[in-house]
Design a protein with these regions (language model features):
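Jelly-roll (double-stranded beta-helix
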Residues: 1-324
Length: 324
């Protein structure tokens, strides 16, 4: 169950369905393959098999868990580099420590988001705190990679610490859905995330049988990924369930519904909605680097091998730039 919730959604601002917007059709629904990341924690590759023209400016997204760790089981990632894009780590339940070679770092937990702009490059590490390793416990989150346009790929690294209590909370007209706006704008309400590439990121919880039709910028793409539960998407009511991604076509609104009966282990439909303005530039992606050309990729690897992306360990405990 997501950590950020409210007892009575009807106390929140309500998002009404747009009166005359063209409904976005569902182009495809894909199923995320499972794998392992870092030191061996389980992930689902949410965007596997989706053509990049439907994802742009998003690059990849991994759902981490949901998993109940036994003592000694929690795992993270070792120190590794990034350049040319942003990582967005959203912890739905659980806790994670992180540190980077630019002096940023801290702990994110229960609805918090770490928004890291790698820009010209840095090193970072993500790991469960020692207390979680010793005791075990619930862990569930996701990590999204967002591309940067060529003009911003070599900008100075930046870090934002977005606390769960600061996300914009909204609801549907009947209170059947809780909408957490992490970044971007929805019906005049702004999320706290500062984005270099215009995007929207929303975590929606729909009660059984609930439906939402949201206004959606026509210059954005549209994606819906199911974290847990069962439902349908689009006017055509295309079925969708845990670990699946729906790709929407053009239009001014998108619709998600929760089935009346949910899986026994999850009471609601949990879905992440993403939209972004396509960058429409060449992309060269290999491992932890996302650039525009192969030469730029080679330069990134050379800079990393020569220590130009930072040193380990970084000074920890500094106030991160852009904390929210």
């Amino acid at each position: 169950m997501p950590a950020v919730t409210v007892e009575n959604p009807l106390t929140l601002p309500r998002v009404a369905a747009p009166a005359e917007a063209v409904a976005r059709p569902v182009l495809t629904v894909t199923t995320a393959p499972s794998g392992f990341e870092g030191e061996g924690f389980p992930v689902r590759r949410a965007f596997a098999g989706i053509n990049y023209r439907h994802l742009d400016p998003f690059i990849m997204m991994d759902q981490m868990g949901e998993v109940e760790y036994a003592p000694g089981e929690p795992k993270g990632t070792p120190w590794h580099p990034h350049r040319g894009f942003e990582t967005v780590t959203y912890i739905i339940d659980g806790i994670f420590d992180h540190q980077d070679s630019n002096g940023g770092g801290g702990t994110i937990t229960n609805g918090d988001t770490q928004w890291m702009t790698a820009g010209s490059g840095l090193l970072h590490i993500e790991a469960p705190p020692e207390a979680l390793v010793m005791s075990g416990g619930l862990f569930h989150g996701l990590q999204l990679w967002v591309n940067l346009p060529a003009k911003d790929k070599m900008m100075a690294p930046r870090y934002q610490d977005i606390r769960g209590g600061n996300v914009q909370l909204l609801t549907s007209p009947d209170g059947g859905a809780l909408l957490r706006v992490i970044a971007g704008e929805l019906d005049g309400h702004q999320g706290p995330g500062i984005t270099h590439t215009p995007i929207s990121m929303i975590h929606a919880t729909l009660a059984p049988g609930a439906e939402i039709t949201l206004p959606w910028r026509e210059d954005f793409n549209g994606l819906a990924y199911v974290l847990a539960g069962r439902g349908s998407v689009g006017a055509e009511r295309r079925a969708i369930h845990t670990g699946q991604t729906a790709v929407f076509g053009d239009g001014g609104s998108l619709t998600v519904r929760a089935d009346e009966k949910q899986d026994s282990h999850t009471p609601d439909l949990e879905v992440v909605l993403l939209g972004g303005q396509p960058i429409r530039e060449p992309m060269a992606h290999y491992g932890p680097f996302v650039m525009n050309t192969r030469d730029e990729l080679q330069q990134a690897f050379d800079d990393f091998q020569k220590g130009r992306l930072g040193t380990i360990p970084a000074v920890h405990g500094m106030t991160p730039e852009g904390g929210i």
